[in-house]
Amino acid sequence: MISSVQNVSNLSMTRALGAVDTENSASSAATTMPGTAGAANGLSFASVLGGMASDAVNSLKGAESMSFAGIKGTATTREVVDSMLQAEQTLQTAIAIRDKVVSAFLEVTKMQM
C-alpha cells in the first residue's frame, strides 16, 4: 500500500496523467507484486482506462447506428435489440467504474495526513 502511494509521486502536476513515469512504476509494481509480473506489459492505467472509454463510446455509437438501420429497415429487430442491450451493458459498466473511482477518491480525501 505504501509503495503504491509512493508511486503517485511519479506523477507531476505539470504533466498529463498519461505521462506517468512508467519505468519506475512498472518496476516497482513488479517487485511488490511478483504474481503480476507477466501482466506488466508497459500499459499505464491511464491508457487502459482511455481504451475502455473509447471502446464504450464506439459501442454506444454502434448501437445508435444500428437503431438508425432498424428505422430504415436494413437491420432486423433482433440485431437492433442485441446492439441496444450490449450498449446498455457497456454503459452500466462505465457507470460502475465511475462510481468506484469516485468512492475511492472520496476515501482518499477523508484520510488523515
UniProtKB/Swiss-Prot annotation:
GO terms for cellular component: bacterial-type flagellum basal body. Its main location: other. GO terms for biological process: bacterial-type flagellum-dependent cell motility. InterPro entries: FliE (IPR001624). Pfam families: FliE (PF02049). It is found in: Bacterial flagellum basal body. The keyword Repeat does not apply. The keyword Iron does not apply. GO terms for molecular function: cytoskeletal motor activity; structural molecule activity. Keywords: Bacterial flagellum. It comes from the Bacteria. Belongs to the FliE family. This is Flagellar hook-basal body complex protein FliE. It comes from Rhizobium etli (strain ATCC 51251 / DSM 11541 / JCM 21823 / NBRC 15573 / CFN 42).
